[in-house]
Amino acid sequence: MAPLITNIYTADPSAHVFNGKLYIYPSHDRETDIQFNDNGDQYDMADYHVFSLDSLDPPSEVTDHGVVLKVEDIPWVSKQLWAPDAATKDGKYYLYFPARDKEGIFRIGVAVSDKPEGPFTPDPEPIKGSYSIDPAVFVDDDGSAYMYFGGLWGGQLQCYQKGNNIFDAEWSGPKEPSGSGAKALGPRVAKLTDDMRQFAEEVREIVILAPETGEPLAADDHDRRFFEAAWMHKYNGKYYFSYSTGDTHYLVYAVGDSPYGPFTYGGRILEPVLGWTTHHSIVEFQGRWWLFHHDCELSKGVDHLRSVKVKEIWYDKDGKIVTEKPE
């Protein structure tokens, strides 16, 4: 499978269909002298590009709309514009992004445009009560919008075990709960306000259940527990929450009846690829379902120089996601 974008290195693709066209909102990888570490310091991204195309089969020419937002534009940000997402409401387009503030703590910001391709104007402060990384915004059928977020280790989610807005620096770095009886840390969700720029409620923790027991996944279940890269989509009235398992490099999903969960683990979507991280999105476009992800094939394995790829996915008669077309 060839990379979809080759003019620059891109990762963490959030794909959306706006006005009949497919738009991709990735992070922008760049060369750096920072050494690889489990905190993710080598992912030193400084701006965002937006891409668009008219078809996927065959792929049409990809348009790079250029830099739409950069670190220098955002008063509260110090560095690391990591995986973004986008949403639309009432003719406005919103770009959601994580970044480190001046104290080195990850927050989530929002920037606004009149066009899906930007450029985007950032709000001067991060979303109040936001923390960690990997925002993914899902707009339900009734127009309600929800933000899913969180990431372990360098994403700092494990630093908030004492509660929302209580940052425990002792948990900084590549750490997470472990050991007998420890439950996996869940991703976070909050409904957004009508203007799409703040949380409308207290942030909640999502519970992902093991199908064989109905109990929350254990912290030591690294093949299934949440690590980062939240995404939500809906199919046949069910909510599909997908995510990366991080250090085991799987893309997996869980299914529930509410945007708040709980979600029951459903299986793997993608096996490990070349490169440390897996981050994705799932979107319906022109009547077919597509999985966007990234790997390091184009850079010949350089971990922080990734490239967006896309593959088709399907659902079987039971609603399970499959990567080969059912008979």
From Swiss-Prot:
First-tier enzyme category under EC: hydrolase
pH dependence per the UniProt record: Optimum pH is 6.5.
Catalytic activity field: Hydrolysis of (1->4)-beta-D-xylans, to remove successive D-xylose residues from the non-reducing termini; Hydrolysis of terminal non-reducing alpha-L-arabinofuranoside residues in alpha-L-arabinosides
Biotechnology: Combining xylanase Xyn11A and xylosidases Xyl43A and/or Xyl43B leads to the release of reducing sugars as high as 1.29 folds of the sum of that released by each enzyme, which contributes to the formulation of optimised enzyme mixtures for the efficient hydrolysis of plant biomass.
Subcellular locations according to the entry: Secreted
Activity regulation description: Activity is inhibited by Ag(+), Li(+), Pb(2+), Cu(2+), Cr(3+), Co(3+), Fe(3+), Ni(2+), Mg(2+), Zn(2+), EDTA and SDS; but not by Mn(2+), Ca(2+) and beta-mercaptoethanol.
Site (Important for catalytic activity, responsible for pKa modulation of the active site Glu and correct orientation of both the proton donor and substrate): 134
Xref: InterPro entries: Glyco_hydro_43 (IPR006710), Glyco_hydro_beta-prop_sf (IPR023296), Glycosyl_Hydrlase_43_Enz (IPR052176)
Entry's family note: Belongs to the glycosyl hydrolase 43 family.
Protein name, per record: Xylosidase/arabinosidase 43A
Organism for this UniProt entry: Humicola insolens (Soft-rot fungus)
